[in-house]
Amino acid sequence: MQKYVCDICGYVYDPAVGDPDNGVAPGTAFADLPEDWVCPECGVSKDEFSPEA
């Protein structure tokens, strides 16, 4: 699955890991994240993420 990188702080969302601290289970694709999910490092929305090159 595609990893996504926060354009602001560089946090990498890895679908294989998810974001368990914020209730996102491993195996959750970026597109399937809740609309109100934000970067756990800097708090920006999903709109501020780009696919990892």
From Swiss-Prot:
Cysteine pairs bridged by disulfides in the record: none
Keywords: Electron transport, Iron, Metal-binding, Transport
Family statement: Belongs to the rubredoxin family.
CDD domains, per database record: rubredoxin
Cofactor note: Binds 1 Fe(3+) ion per subunit.
Record domain Rubredoxin-like: where: 1-53
Gene Ontology molecular functions: electron transfer activity; iron ion binding
Membrane-crossing segments per the record: none
Source organism of the structure: Butyribacterium methylotrophicum
List of residues binding Fe cation: 6, 9, 39, 42
PROSITE patterns documented for this protein: RUBREDOXIN (PS00202), RUBREDOXIN_LIKE (PS50903)
InterPro entries xrefs: Rubredoxin, Rubredoxin-like_dom, Rubredoxin_dom, Rubredoxin_ET, Rubredoxin_Fe_BS
Cofactor dependence: Fe(3+)
This protein's name: Rubredoxin
Function as written in the Swiss-Prot or TrEMBL entry: Rubredoxin is a small nonheme, iron protein lacking acid-labile sulfide. Its single Fe, chelated to 4 Cys, functions as an electron acceptor and may also stabilize the conformation of the molecule.
Domain of life (superkingdom): Bacteria
PANTHER family (alphabetical): RUBREDOXIN, RUBREDOXIN-1-RELATED
Pfam families: Rubredoxin
GO biological process: alkane catabolic process
